[in-house]
Swiss-Prot record:
Taxonomic source organism: Homo sapiens (Human)
Keywords, alphabetical: Activator, Chromosomal rearrangement, Cytoplasm, Disease variant, DNA-binding, Nucleus, Phosphoprotein, Transcription, Transcription regulation
Record's note on what induces expression: Not induced by interferons.
The name this protein goes by in its record: Interferon regulatory factor 4
Subunit and partners: Interacts with the BATF-JUNB heterodimer. Interacts with BATF (via bZIP domain); the interaction is direct. Interacts with SPIB. Interacts with DEF6. Directly interacts with NLRP3 in the nucleus of Th2 cells; this interaction enhances IRF4 ability to bind to the IL4 promoter and is required for optimal IRF4-dependent IL4 transcription. Interacts with SPI1.
Length: 451
């Protein structure tokens, strides 16, 4: 989906990819056992770990008939490719299988055993036993202050949560991955809408009365994935930590700059994230497309256009409950600065085709709490991406192409804390009237394609 400046417009649609009900699990086992695909082999006698070839289509020795055969077979199996009718698209085939593997709780990638920098690269996955799946975890919190008076049942997919009282907003972190918050089936199957209306999707909570007689209430408007659970079994709200409740909001506020001139500002809403790039959009991807505009005629136009020519596949950004992630797909070098950057005085590079965490939800909440209760500095939440030039660079501050990215809810919490200073305790209210409602009412097309 294309997003124009100001975040206006859009369309709603959905696709029907599904690897639920163990379909992908059994399909892959059958393919490995068939021996039809070179390099797709079991790694152990128990047949619980397997190797899958993962050659990039840009390699000189890439053979589409052989290297893309498995990905094509998955597309055929899912009805996403019709031989003789549809145009062959190996990168999309590969992406569909990758996303299906990542979203399924039947598989776990063994990153330390994968080899992606050799002539015949491959990934290694483990088949997760039924009893060890993340979706089957029963999570509990023993802190009585975090117990809720009324349990509720989370129904799929992505329901509106009823009003609840949350007695302690800044809950301690849990040892959970962001995948614990996503449904077992891949997102494209879900007729999902990121917040379209305010009232029904509000998560309301009320904190205890404070010593000064004040009481803070808050309402979150967020994309709230359900916990995996047995049908008909109520789920205690206390199993969701604060970051899961608050940062299931998938929206990102993005500003694009040429030199120091703002050329586009918008808010994304796709739960799969967005792609910042230039030129044509990728029809196979339903990520929110954030396109750098063609530069106006000025002294730096040629230099800017030269850098933009290398942004064709762009960089993908997405917000998970535990933080903001990025994956650089384009040829252009991308450098970044933000709260998780290792260096403040020298460049931090986004490596190509590698996932990088740019913002940590729990760290932000903890630092915000430290500001509220102990008077410490407000936490950072803005991430800056610099395209084609090293950054940060104290010797040369002005850059040709940059993007400023902010998780929307972090931005709102930050400004509320700043405005209320020491009176900030456990929550905030979203304003009832928002200046640009189009940013929050955008219909979306939804997909898991990131590559």
């Amino acid at each position: 989906m294309n997003l124009e400046g100001g975040g206006r417009g859009g369309e709603f649609g959905m696709s029907a990819v599904s690897c639920g009900n163990g379909k992908l699990r059994q399909w892959l086992i059958d393919q490995i056992d068939s021996g039809k695909y070179p390099g797709l082999v079991w790694e152990n006698e128990e047949k619980s770990i397997f190797r899958i070839p993962w050659k990039h289509a840009g390699k000189q020795d890439y053979n589409r008939e052989e290297d893309a055969a498995l990905f094509k077979a998955w597309a055929l199996f899912k009805g996403k490719f019709r031989e003789g009718i549809d145009k062959p698209d190996p990168p999309t085939w590969k992406t569909r299988l990758r996303c299906a593997l990542n979203k399924s709780n039947d598989f776990e990638e063994l990153v330390e055993r994968s080899q992606l920098d050799i002539s015949d690269p491959y990934k290694v996955y483990r088949i997760v036993p039924e009893g060890a799946k993340k979706g089957a975890k029963q999570l509990t919190l023993e802190d009585p202050q975090m117990s809720m008076s009324h349990p509720y049942t989370m129904t799929t997919p992505y329901p509106s949560l009823p009003a609840q009282q949350v007695h302690n907003y800044m809950m301690p972190p849990l040892d959970r991955s962001w995948r614990d918050y996503v449904p077992d089936q891949p997102h494209p199957e879900i007729p999902y809408q990121c917040p379209m209306t305010f009232g029904p999707r509000g998560h309301h909570w009320q904190g205890p009365a404070c010593e000064n007689g004040c009481q803070v209430t808050g309402t979150f408007y967020a994309c709230a994935p359900p916990e995996s659970q047995a049908p008909g079994v109520p789920t205690e709200p206390s199993i969701r930590s604060a970051e899961a409740l608050a940062f299931s909001d998938c929206r990102l506020h993005i500003c694009l700059y040429y030199r120091e001139i703002l050329v586009k500002e918008l808010t994304t809403s796709s739960p799969e994230g967005c792609r910042i790039s230039h030129g044509h959009t990728y029809d196979a991807s339903n990520l929110d497309q954030v396109l750098f505009p063609y530069p106006e005629d000025n002294g730096q136009r040629k230099n800017i256009e030269k850098l933009l020519s290398h942004l064709e596949r762009g960089v993908v950004l997405w917000m998970a409950p535990d933080g903001l992630y990025a994956k650089r797909l384009c040829q252009s070098r991308i450098y970044w600065d933000g709260p998780l950057a290792l260096c403040n005085d020298r460049p931090n590079k986004l490596e190509r085709d590698q996932t990088c965490k740019l913002f940590d939800t729990q760290q932000f909440l903890s630092e915000l709490q430290a500001f509220a209760h102990h008077g410490r500095s407000l936490p950072r939440f803005q991430v800056t991406l610099c395209f084609g030039e090293e950054f940060p660079d104290p010797q040369r501050q002005r850059k040709l192409i940059t993007a400023h990215v902010e998780p929307l809810l972090a931005r709102q919490l930050y400004y509320f804390a700043q405005q209320n200073s020491g009176h900030f305790l456990r929550g905030y209210d979203l304003p009832e009237h928002i200046s640009n409602p189009e940013d929050y009412h955008r219909s979306i097309r939804h997909s898991s394609i990131q590559e």
